[in-house]
């Protein structure tokens, strides 16, 4: 089966010039600003979308923005677990993580997945550097305490899943100042050195807050947030989100994504979007054009 051509490759010179002209005011507006991108879903597994993502990130850096990538890797973790005869289990969108699973998470995310992303960005002209929470004490964490959403009196033990207690941004800012693109694996570490698996959406949201990011973009395998009828919701307020949580419209893996997005919006991130990672060049479309490709989250 042949690869689907990149849409950008078949544009006429006139159309490309028009696109660049449209991007100019956005480049001016966001020059020097930090953009945090949660990279996950199909965009991580389909070759043409991988290329599109890498080119977008490098272009954003070259025109003066400061992209920071926080990546997931759920399918890769599931594959690795299957190879050792384990089945992944989730509770309220969080992966149950015993000690053996945590070992797999560390070498899959901090090794295989992270290095693949770093290499991919570097191959198209960027300078990416991989980080985990241990590097520069970037992500400090403690064991996550959860309760049954249907019965808050019942605690849930989901193993070595972490809550972020502190983000130390110095190492990220130093890399940005030297024109590197940080690629962050969502692994935190406790005071005693215990490694914790942290949901990548949560890490991306907290990183955007601490870095004072202009934008947070969460890449997904859907057009954005959908209502019960499958219709795209182009914008969500805090009140609407509460209603969608209550009636079950937002559930599973979308729960931490929306919660983290709303927290980021409430804590100073100017623009938060859930974007369709299946759309080639979705980052450029969302950041540098008038055409949005997802759902905007507002704290109001």
Swiss-Prot record:
Gene3D superfamilies: Acetylglutamate kinase-like. Its EC number is 2.7.2.8. The record marks 38, 257 as: Transition state stabilizer. It is an enzyme of class 2 (transferase). Its main location: cytoplasm. PANTHER family: N-ACETYLGLUTAMATE SYNTHASE (PTHR23342), N-ACETYLGLUTAMATE SYNTHASE, MITOCHONDRIAL (PTHR23342:SF0). GO terms for cellular component: cytoplasm. Catalyzes the ATP-dependent phosphorylation of N-acetyl-L-glutamate. This is Acetylglutamate kinase. It is found in: Cytoplasm. The gene is argB. Belongs to the acetylglutamate kinase family. ArgB subfamily. GO terms for biological process: arginine biosynthetic process via ornithine; L-arginine biosynthetic process. Keywords: Amino-acid biosynthesis, Arginine biosynthesis, ATP-binding, Cytoplasm, Kinase, Nucleotide-binding, Transferase. The keyword Kinase applies. It catalyses: N-acetyl-L-glutamate + ATP = N-acetyl-L-glutamyl 5-phosphate + ADP. InterPro entries: AceGlu_kinase-like_sf (IPR036393), AcgluKinase_fam (IPR004662), ArgB (IPR037528), Asp/Glu/Uridylate_kinase (IPR001048), Glu/AcGlu_kinase (IPR001057), NAGK-C (IPR041727). Substrate binds at residues 73-74, 95, 197. Pfam families: AA_kinase. It comes from Bordetella pertussis (strain Tohama I / ATCC BAA-589 / NCTC 13251). Pathway: Amino-acid biosynthesis; L-arginine biosynthesis; N(2)-acetyl-L-ornithine from L-glutamate: step 2/4. GO terms for molecular function: acetylglutamate kinase activity; ATP binding.
């Amino acid at each position: 089966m042949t690869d689907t051509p990149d849409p950008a490759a078949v544009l006429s010179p006139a159309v490309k010039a028009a696109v660049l002209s449209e991007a100019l005011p956005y480049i001016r507006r966001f020059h020097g600003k930090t953009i945090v991108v949660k990279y996950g879903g199909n965009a991580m597994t389909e070759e043409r979308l991988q290329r599109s993502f890498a080119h977008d990130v490098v272009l954003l850096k070259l025109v003066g923005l400061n992209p920071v990538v926080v990546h997931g890797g759920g399918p890769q973790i599931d594959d690795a677990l299957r190879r050792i005869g384990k089945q992944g289990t989730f509770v309220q969108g969080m992966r149950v993580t015993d000690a053996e699973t945590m070992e797999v998470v560390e070498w899959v995310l901090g090794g295989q997945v992270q290095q693949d992303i770093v290499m991919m960005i570097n191959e198209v002209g960027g300078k990416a550097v991989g980080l985990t929470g241990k590097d520069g004490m970037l992500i400090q964490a403690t064991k996550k305490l959860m309760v049954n959403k249907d019965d808050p009196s019942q605690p849930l033990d989901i193993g070595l899943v972490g809550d972020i207690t502190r983000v130390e941004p110095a190492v990220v800012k130093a890399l940005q100042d030297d024109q590197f693109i940080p690629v962050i694996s969502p692994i935190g570490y406790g005071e005693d050195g215990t490694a914790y698996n942290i949901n990548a959406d949560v890490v991306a949201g907290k990183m955007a807050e601490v870095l004072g990011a202009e934008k947070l973009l969460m890449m997904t395998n859907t057009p954005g947030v959908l209502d019960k009828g499958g219709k795209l919701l182009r914008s969500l307020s805090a009140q609407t989100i509460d209603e969608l949580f209550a009636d079950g419209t937002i559930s599973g893996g979308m729960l931490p994504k929306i919660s983290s997005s709303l927290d980021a919006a409430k804590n100073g991130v100017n623009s938060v979007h859930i974007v369709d990672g299946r759309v080639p060049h979705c980052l450029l479309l969302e950041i540098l054009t008038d055409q949005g490709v997802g759902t905007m989250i507002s704290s109001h």
